[in-house]
């Protein structure tokens, strides 16, 4: 009996120790625009501390195995830096990926450029997220993107599966509007943090949520076993994208999806499937982003 209890205790300890955090992020900071040589040590410190914070923080109650962690990248370009105040003006390019079933291919799930990734940072500043008492815009933005990455990843596996975590991102938005930085408030910019999340959760854009699920789970994940059926499912998902665009033509969300998925979609249909399928894919993508006509011409061949 004692041996059995010992084994159970050992198993529980192993399970707890084998649980991993949700994100596996790579942070890169580019500072070529900054001539001040004093900054390099600070920038290197910021890069390491940000990466450790994102990867070591437990963002949700979810239990992930190491191999299930979500790959993501935070590429930060410093445009301005005040060494006296510690104020940074930077641009963030964030993207997350997930593996496609039965393949070695990773697909981009969510990618966004944030031109207002501005914050104050001094070496030694605490890096911890306290939802009810956060005063750091840097920490708020990282928390927002962490929840967005997790939420959008869940959306790709089940219909509206990321709702809880997208609402957590929404909570960050609501609590950060008094921090005094751009990106959190409505009407500043339709592509800002508030605008993209608000539009995505808007019932009028429900087609986007159908798209995220059907494109990935019903489409890409079956591409190896049944390419024709998978392409048909992806086209059906793109019809939902078209519906979302028609419902809110001024929303940036449908166009954002086409920007980071365009090349992948072209590769899926170019020279494959039926001519009717290729023509329909062309029409959908062109209607959302007419400036991409030259790139879309591959679908016509």
Features from the language model and the residues they span:
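Second-shell loop/turn segments in exported
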Residues: 32-40, 128-136, 246-247
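Sec-exported extracytoplasmic/periplasmic mature domains
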Residues: 51-59, 151-154, 266, 270
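Bacterial Sec-dependent N-terminal signal peptides
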Residues: 1-23
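Start-of-domain marker
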Residues: 21-89, 100-102
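Flexible, glycine-rich surface segments
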Residues: 158-250
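Acidic/His-rich structured neighborhood in mature extracellular/periplasmic domains
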Residues: 84-195
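A cross-kingdom marker for long, charged
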Residues: 28, 213-301
């Amino acid at each position: 009996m004692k041996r059995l209890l010992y084994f159970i205790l050992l198993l529980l300890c192993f399970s707890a120790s084998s649980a991993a955090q949700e994100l596996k992020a790579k942070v890169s900071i580019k500072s070529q625009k900054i001539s001040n040589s004093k900054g390099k040590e600070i920038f290197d410190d910021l890069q390491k501390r940000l990466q450790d914070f994102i990867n070591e923080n437990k963002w949700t109650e979810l239990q992930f195995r190491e191999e299930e962690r979500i790959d993501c990248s935070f590429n930060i370009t410093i445009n301005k830096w005040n060494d006296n105040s510690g104020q940074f003006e930077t641009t963030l390019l964030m993207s997350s990926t997930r593996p496609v079933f039965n393949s070695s291919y990773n697909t981009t799930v969510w990618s966004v450029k944030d031109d207002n990734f501005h914050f104050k940072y001094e070496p030694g500043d605490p890096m911890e997220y306290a939802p009810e008492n956060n005063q750091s815009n840097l920490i708020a933005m990282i928390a927002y993107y962490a929840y967005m990455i997790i939420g959008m990843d869940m959306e790709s596996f089940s219909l509206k599966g990321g709702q809880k975590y997208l609402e957590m991102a929404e909570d960050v938005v609501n609590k950060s509007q008094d921090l005094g930085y751009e990106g959190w408030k409505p009407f500043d910019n339709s592509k800002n943090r508030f605008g993209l999340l608000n539009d995505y959760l808007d019932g009028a854009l429900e087609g986007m949520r159908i798209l995220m699920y059907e494109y990935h789970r019903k489409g890409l994940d079956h591409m190896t076993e049944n390419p024709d059926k998978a392409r048909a499912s992806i086209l059906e998902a793109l019809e939902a994208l078209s519906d979302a665009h028609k419902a809110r033509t001024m929303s940036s969300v449908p166009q954002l999806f086409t920007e980071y998925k365009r090349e992948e979609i072209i590769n899926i249909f170019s020279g494959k499937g039926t001519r009717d399928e290729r023509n329909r894919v062309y029409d959908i993508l062109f209607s959302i982003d007419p400036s991409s006509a030259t790139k879309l011409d591959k679908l016509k061949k």
